[in-house]
């Protein structure tokens, strides 16, 4: 597995034509985040020994990795991160990075149950952000397998990981998705590797 980090506020090398086409019409901030994410993605492909290639955006907005690679890209306002692995070693990967700032308490009920928030052992707004990040990483890992869009209530935070509340293709009801999470003073990073 390989990872790379880029700053979305800094200029990055030019994109491939299909990557450039994907950001036509986007605002400058989103274009910079996309370019930084793809730059990080290109770096992880190089680290894995893959030939240089584009990472186009699919209709579902997910990155399209080479057929022998699984990967994920995420960004916050301060950092873009990409992680990837050869598909012979890892089934799927999901990553999420968020600035560690409290969400409005009103949003917490849309993201997590009171029991899930309690698992985070943090004030409600920070707990909601951390649950959001975990669910986002798990969503990104399961999506290439299930091809099923999920709402926040489809996955439940447990001490062992996130549990499916109902079956989706490739996962039975109760299937666990392992998620690791790290926080520091500025960022929350969640990673799900299947």
Which functions belong to the PLM regions below?
Residues 1-194:
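Core catalytic alpha/beta fold that binds nucleotide/phospho-ligands
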């Amino acid at each position: 597995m390989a990872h790379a980090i880029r700053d979305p506020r800094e200029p990055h090398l030019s994109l491939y034509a299909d990557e450039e086409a994907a950001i036509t019409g986007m605002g400058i901030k989103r274009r910079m985040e996309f370019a930084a994410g793809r730059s990080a993605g290109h770096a992880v492909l190089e680290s894995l020994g893959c030939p240089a290639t584009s990472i186009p955006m699919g209709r579902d907005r997910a990155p399209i990795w080479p057929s022998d690679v699984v990967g994920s890209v995420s960004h916050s306002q301060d950092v873009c991160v990409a992680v990837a692995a050869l598909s012979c070693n890892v089934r799927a990967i999901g990553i999420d990075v968020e600035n560690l700032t409290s969400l409005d308490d009103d949003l917490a009920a849309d993201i997590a149950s009171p029991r899930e928030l309690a698992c985070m052992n943090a004030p409600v707004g920070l707990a909601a952000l951390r649950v959001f990040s975990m669910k986002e990483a798990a969503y990104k890992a399961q999506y290439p397998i299930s091809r099923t869009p999920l709402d926040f209530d489809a996955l439940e935070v447990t001490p062992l990981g996130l549990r499916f509340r109902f079956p989706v293709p490739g996962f039975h009801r109760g299937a666990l998705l392992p998620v690791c999470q790290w926080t520091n003073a500025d960022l929350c990073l969640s990673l799900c590797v299947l």
